[in-house]
């Protein structure tokens, strides 16, 4: 296969080619912007938004519910119907996740221990603009926050088009900030104009967005530090090389730093996919971006299904797509991925565009330790301890006294001892 398209790689080589999602340069450039917006609020936010071309001087920086509703009302009927259909699938999946949650109550000596689940109050949802404005990301983030019962939801997106504003209305957002980059993240974190400081900021963005999320991470929760988009396709000799090429290109066109990978049991498949890649690139508008991304990824040829599973788990990609005769049998054996796509009629793009599961997913191998955006991202588990029968709680008090002294924390032991003393006095 041509080295200019999808070169042969080993799994360790692919791991070495991954970059940290937050570079020193991006941090250095984002930090003064974040500090300025934190100190200067709306005035500083507007200055940066106009400087970076998010809005024209004097143009609206904040779109309230009324403006979003107008954008939705002006949407052509066909576009609105399709957007509603996508939104309903995303909402339905998120609602099913929410229904799976339940409170917990466990009896303890003298009382009960509980956990209760509650949403954060304010969420900020970032949706990329720039090269490819993503109304799908507006739905994936803001709609999921609303399903989680978040009270106050703002979206930030640079140069939002009518479709993105309409998507925000459909998601139930309270408003849209027409700005991106580090200044938008700072506005969400610390507040600016009508935006109160957020409790959590979610959503994918460029390296400056990601750097800013790291910078504000001590003041506000964040979902993840996302790097370039990734797709790994695990295929055998029954796979359609044209479909594989199309799916790899769909991921590659996101970003010249995207990482498309083919893991295959068939040594001949890479050449067939290479032919398809070259053919499909000829008339693709984003060919230059996609071709640059293909060079970041590669092909890993494996000798067995077990070796292929090990390779996929070591890569731990954002998206993992199975093009195997027994994909359904292999799927449960895989451990590390952000989203898994299985079946001859399935494609990763269906997950991107609203089959139901969320498309905001972990990258850079972090799928080993975390999952994608969901209603759980916006929820807090709060624990309760209630003691109704102090006499029955004696074992708790005795154990607390013992542990306090075992750890050298005498005040802890004495606090428990006082309660025990009231039972014997």
Predicted features along the sequence, with ranges:
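Conserved small-residue-rich beta-alpha loop and adjacent elements
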Residues: 104-167
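C-terminal core of ALDH-fold dehydrogenases
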Residues: 313-425
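Conserved NAD(P)+-binding/catalytic subdomain of aldehyde/semialdehyde dehydrogenases
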Residues: 172-261
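N-terminal Rossmann-like NAD(P)+-binding subdomain of aldehyde/semialdehyde dehydrogenases
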Residues: 1-121
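Short acidic-hydrophobic, aromatic-tinged amphipathic segments that line or gate anion-handling sites
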Residues: 1-10, 175-180, 299-304
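Alpha-helix C-terminal capping segments
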Residues: 140-151, 169-171, 189-195, 213-215, ...
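A glycine- and small/hydrophobic-rich beta-loop-beta segment
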Residues: 250, 254, 262-337
């Amino acid at each position: 296969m041509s080295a200019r398209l999808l070169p042969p790689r080993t799994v360790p080589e692919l791991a070495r080619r991954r970059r940290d999602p937050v570079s020193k340069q991006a941090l250095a450039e984002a930090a003064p912007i974040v500090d300025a917006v934190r100190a200067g609020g709306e005035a500083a936010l507007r200055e940066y938004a106009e400087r970076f071309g998010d809005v024209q001087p004097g143009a609206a920086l904040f779109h309230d519910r009324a403006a979003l509703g107008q954008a939705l009302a002006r949407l052509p009927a066909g576009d609105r119907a399709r957007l509603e259909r996508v939104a309903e699938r995303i909402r339905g999946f998120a609602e099913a996740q929410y229904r799976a949650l339940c409170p917990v109550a466990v009896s303890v000596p003298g009382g009960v221990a509980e956990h209760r689940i509650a949403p954060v109050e304010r969420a900020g949802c970032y949706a990329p603009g720039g090269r490819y404005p993503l109304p799908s990301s507006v739905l994936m983030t803001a709609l999921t926050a609303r399903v989680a019962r978040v009270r106050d939801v703002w979206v930030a997106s640079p140069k939002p088009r009518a479709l993105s504003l309409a998507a925000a209305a459909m998601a139930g957002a309270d408003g849209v900030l027409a700005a991106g980059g580090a200044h938008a993240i700072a506005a969400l974190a610390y507040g600016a104009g009508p935006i109160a400081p957020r409790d959590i900021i979610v959503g994918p963005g460029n390296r400056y967005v990601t750097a800013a999320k790291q910078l504000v991470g001590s003041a506000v929760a964040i979902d993840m530090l996302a790097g370039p988009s990734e797709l790994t396709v695990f295929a055998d000799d029954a796979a359609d090389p044209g479909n594989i090429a199309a799916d790899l290109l769909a991921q590659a066109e996101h970003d010249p730093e995207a990482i498309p990978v083919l893991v295959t049991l068939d040594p001949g498949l890479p050449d067939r996919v290479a032919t398809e890649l070259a053919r499909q690139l000829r008339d693709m508008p984003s060919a230059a971006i996609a071709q640059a991304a293909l060079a970041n990824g590669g092909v890993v040829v494996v000798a067995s299904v077990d070796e292929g599973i090990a390779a996929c788990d070591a890569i731990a990609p954002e998206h993992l797509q199975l093009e195997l005769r027994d994909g359904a049998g292999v799927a449960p054996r895989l451990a590390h991925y952000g989203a898994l796509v299985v079946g001859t009629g399935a494609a990763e793009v269906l997950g991107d565009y609203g089959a139901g599961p969320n498309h905001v997913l972990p990258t850079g191998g972090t799928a080993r330790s975390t999952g994608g955006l969901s209603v759980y991202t916006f929820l807090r588990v709060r624990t309760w301890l209630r003691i109704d029968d102090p006499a029955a709680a004696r074992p708790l008090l005795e154990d607390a006294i013992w542990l306090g002294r075992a750890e050298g924390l005498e005040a802890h032991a004495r606090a428990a001892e006082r309660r025990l003393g009231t039972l014997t006095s």
